[in-house]
């Protein structure tokens, strides 16, 4: 939620930012907010004036009664003032609701470094890492997407898609999951289950080493938490509701972690607060018909390890760089080639002031795919959830800044590992950093193994 003071003092900044985001219909909202706000403040002043007048009348009534003088006229006037105050308070309340309707639906103000663009095609790659394995049939596309800034190894054989590798390795059952639950669900099996759990523990250990507090949050939250954490559009496209309850299944641990300190004033000396959440995530994927319908890249449920930071406003941009670097280090240890992308205004979403994505190179698909998102939400969530801090008890509280980043979304990390570490026969090498968690160094095709999870 935006600060009403920003709209009062710099409405053109807000309008220009909406234009950059492509939110042209909402530009006129700024003038409507200013109009309503002026009316709201005028009525508040009138309420205060009437209260002052009523108090003066009350004093005068007291004086007259002591003298035995009549007070009927003053009492009548006082009653009229009380009635008028009540009417004005109702009007002020209605005006506030109208103002809040707009404020709660305006996106965050973007950082100056966010590129202006319409959609994901206008996102800007800012750095690359790793040596990619590229099938010769994908080389031209790879060179274009990597801008010639990545090392690569040419594969003469065509790498398989992760969904085919899962079948070869006996790692998933999609047909039975569809029977039981419908599309975009899956049973993970055998070594892939161990790999999923290994990724969670690996990411968790690395972030604990960096000072993050591990958290398993509630998997369901109340509506005020979702409204405070995300845009209203997500209620239609993303979030599952529990029928007849004020509870919603979390689409990410970010949301319960954001709500953790709702309506609190934090002690400034405790900032930054660093949390690493571990949870399942549940998503409708309502707006993605036809996209990634096979496999485990875009699904209704998956496990995720999430970084979440409460910081001082003046430190949040430094923390934004830190959390994306944390995620990069994880994928470097997993030996996954990737690029980091600065997300443009048209693809940014409402909550973030700036967002980086890590996109892993997928040899089977022949393109980069998103595996991490890291956002600085500045005070947008903190205002909605009323999360503030102060350094001294006599100091006026200020809103914190909140930041979040994927550490590991296990399903997408598994896709990246399968496609990047496959051999021609379908065997998949396990990154060395995971050996101590998996207990095995490779996964071989079903027909080549005697039992699951052999070392």
From Swiss-Prot:
Known catalytic reactions: tRNA(Ser) + L-serine + ATP = L-seryl-tRNA(Ser) + AMP + diphosphate + H(+); tRNA(Sec) + L-serine + ATP = L-seryl-tRNA(Sec) + AMP + diphosphate + H(+)
Enzyme Commission number, as recorded: 6.1.1.11
Molecular-function GO terms, alphabetical: ATP binding; serine-tRNA ligase activity
Keyword Aminoacyl-tRNA synthetase set for record: yes
Pathway named in the protein's UniProt entry: Aminoacyl-tRNA biosynthesis; selenocysteinyl-tRNA(Sec) biosynthesis; L-seryl-tRNA(Sec) from L-serine and tRNA(Sec): step 1/1
GO cellular component terms, semicolon-separated: cytoplasm
Protein's GO biological process: selenocysteine biosynthetic process; seryl-tRNA aminoacylation
Record-listed L-serine binding positions: 252-254, 306, 406
Segments passing through the bilayer: none
Keywords: Aminoacyl-tRNA synthetase, ATP-binding, Cytoplasm, Ligase, Nucleotide-binding, Protein biosynthesis
Residue numbers binding ATP: 283-285, 299, 370-373
UniProt xrefs under Pfam families: Seryl_tRNA_N, tRNA-synt_2b
Subcellular location: Cytoplasm
The protein's enzyme class: ligase
Stored PANTHER family: SERYL-TRNA SYNTHETASE (PTHR11778)
UniProt note: domains: Consists of two distinct domains, a catalytic core and a N-terminal extension that is involved in tRNA binding.
Family, similarity comment: Belongs to the class-II aminoacyl-tRNA synthetase family. Type-1 seryl-tRNA synthetase subfamily.
This protein's name: Serine--tRNA ligase
Species this protein is from: Pyrococcus horikoshii (strain ATCC 700860 / DSM 12428 / JCM 9974 / NBRC 100139 / OT-3)
Lineage, opening ranks: Archaea, Methanobacteriati, Methanobacteriota, Thermococci, Thermococcales
